[in-house]
C-alpha cells in the first residue's frame, strides 16, 4: 500500500518521528501532508506554507490547499492508497489541525482512500465549554458545529464527523482509529513537544481557550514574549502594575503591539487547578474592553469567528458579566455532551 501521512513535528514515537519509523520498517511512504505551521512546526500562525520536500527523507510534502475549496488536488490524492493521521491537537475549535484533518477526510471520501488515525490524548480533554459554532461563522478557525472546548481526541472527533455526516455533501470516509492505551478523559496529559510556536508549555495550552479572543482585538496576548497566551495588555491600558514589550521572535515575527510597552495582566502564576476550575473565562477580555473604552473599535469581525456566535460581543457591550454570558451557552454544552457520547472511545 502507498502511504501518505498527515503529521508535523509532534508525530513522535519516543524520540523518533512516525515518518522515520515507517521508512525504517520498509513501508512505502509516498507523501506528507502538513498543517498550519508546516511539517517541522516552525512557521508563524496563518503563514503560507508551500509544498516542498522533507530534507531529511526526500519524501514530498504536499499542500493541503492546492486544490479547489481548500482541499488537496486530484493529482495529490491519486498518489496514495491510505492516509495515516498522527498529529497532536489541543482540543479547541479554533486550533486548525482538526479542520485540516476534516478536509483530508473529505478528499479521501471523494477519492475512495482509507484513513487511519493514530490517536493521541487531548490536553484539554477533561471538560466541554463554550458555545456551539453557529455555522454562518464557519471558517478556517471554526469548521464544525462543536463548542470551543469539545473535549474529544482527534480519533473521537473523526468518528463523530463521519457519524453525524458533517463532511460536505454528507460524505463519509473509510475510517479506522487506533485508540490510546490507558487513557481516560480525566487523564492529565502533559505534551512532550509544543504543538505550535506560540503554545510553548502547558500553561499556554490551558489558558488558550480564555485568551485567544484577544487575537480579534488590539490587545496583545503575549505573542513575541516568553508568555504567549498567558498575559494580556495594551499601551493605553491604565491602572496595572504589570507591563511587557512584544518583540520579533521565531514563530511571532510581527506580533501585535511590536516594540510597544504594554500594560496589563500576567496570568502565568495562576495554578493549573484554578484555570481548569474556571474553564473558559471571558473576564480577561471584558476587563480589557472596559479599561480601553474603545467601544466599537475594540472587537474586529474575527471575534465572532473565534467565539462562534453573535451574542457574546453583544452581551459584553451590554455590560454583562463572564458568568452571565457562560450561563447562555450552558445548554449548548449539555446538548453536545449527549450528541458526542456514541463516539467517545475513552471513559469520561
Give names to the regions the model predicted.
Residues 1-27:
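N-terminal phosphate-binding or glycine-rich loops at protein starts, especially the Walker A/P-loop
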Residues 28-38, 118:
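Short internal beta-strands
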Residues 41-46, 116-138:
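Glycine-rich, charge-decorated loop segments at or immediately adjacent to ligand/cofactor-binding or catalytic sites
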Residues 50-80:
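Glycine-rich oxoanion-binding loops at beta->alpha junctions
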Residues 89-101:
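Glycine/threonine-rich flexible loop motifs
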Residues 137-210:
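Conserved anion/nucleotide-ligand pocket segment
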Residues 181-258:
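Glycine-rich, aromatic-lined ligand/substrate-binding cores of catalytic
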Residues 228, 232-330, 348:
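Conserved functional hotspot residues or short segments at active or partner-binding sites
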Amino acid at each position: 500500500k502507498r502511504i501518505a501521512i498527515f503529521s508535523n513535528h509532534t508525530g513522535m514515537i519516543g524520540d523518533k518521528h512516525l515518518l522515520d519509523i515507517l521508512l525504517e520498517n520498509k513501508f512505502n511512504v509516498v507523501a506528507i501532508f502538513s498543517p498550519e505551521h508546516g511539517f517541522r512546526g516552525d512557521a508563524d500562525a496563518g503563514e503560507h506554507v508551500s509544498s516542498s520536500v522533507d530534507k531529511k527523507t526526500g519524501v514530498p510534502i504536499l499542500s493541503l490547499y492546492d486544490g479547489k475549496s481548500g482541499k488537496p488536488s486530484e493529482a495529490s490524492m491519486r498518489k496514495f492508497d491510505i492516509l495515516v493521521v498522527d498529529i497532536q491537537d489541543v482540543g479547541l475549535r479554533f486550533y486548525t489541525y482538526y479542520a485540516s484533518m476534516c478536509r483530508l477526510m473529505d478528499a479521501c471520501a471523494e477519492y475512495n482512500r482509507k484513513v487511519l488515525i493514530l490517536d493521541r490524548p487531548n490536553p484539554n480533554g477533561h471538560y466541554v465549554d463554550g458555545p456551539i459554532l453557529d455555522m454562518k461563522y464557519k471558517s478556517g478557525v471554526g469548521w464544525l458545529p462543536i463548542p470551543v472546548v469539545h473535549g474529544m481526541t482527534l480519533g473521537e472527533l473523526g468518528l463523530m464527523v463521519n457519524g453525524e455526516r458533517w463532511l460536505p455533501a454528507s460524505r463519509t470516509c473509510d475510517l479506522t482509529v487506533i485508540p490510546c492505551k490507558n487513557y481516560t478523559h480525566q487523564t492529565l496529559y502533559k505534551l512532550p513537544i509544543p504543538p505550535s510556536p506560540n503554545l510553548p508549555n502547558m500553561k499556554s495550552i490551558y489558558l488558550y481557550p480564555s485568551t485567544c479572543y484577544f487575537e480579534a482585538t488590539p490587545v496583545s496576548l503575549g505573542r513575541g514574549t516568553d508568555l504567549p497566551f498567558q498575559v494580556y495588555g495594551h499601551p493605553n491600558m491604565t491602572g496595572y502594575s504589570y507591563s511587557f514589550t512584544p518583540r520579533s521572535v521565531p514563530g511571532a515575527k510581527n506580533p501585535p503591539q511590536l516594540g510597544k510597552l504594554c500594560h496589563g495582566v500576567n496570568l502565568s502564576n495562576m495554578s493549573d487547578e484554578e484555570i481548569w476550575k474556571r474553564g473558559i473565562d471571558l473576564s480577561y477580555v471584558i476587563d480589557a474592553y472596559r479599561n480601553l473604552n474603545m467601544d466599537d473599535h475594540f472587537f474586529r469581525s474575527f471575534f465572532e469567528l473565534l467565539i462562534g456566535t453573535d451574542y457574546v460581543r453583544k452581551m459584553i457591550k451590554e455590560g454583562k458579566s463572564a458568568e452571565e454570558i457562560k450561563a447562555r451557552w450552558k445548554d449548548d454544552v449539555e446538548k453536545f455532551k449527549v450528541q458526542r457520547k456514541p463516539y467517545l472511545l475513552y471513559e469520561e
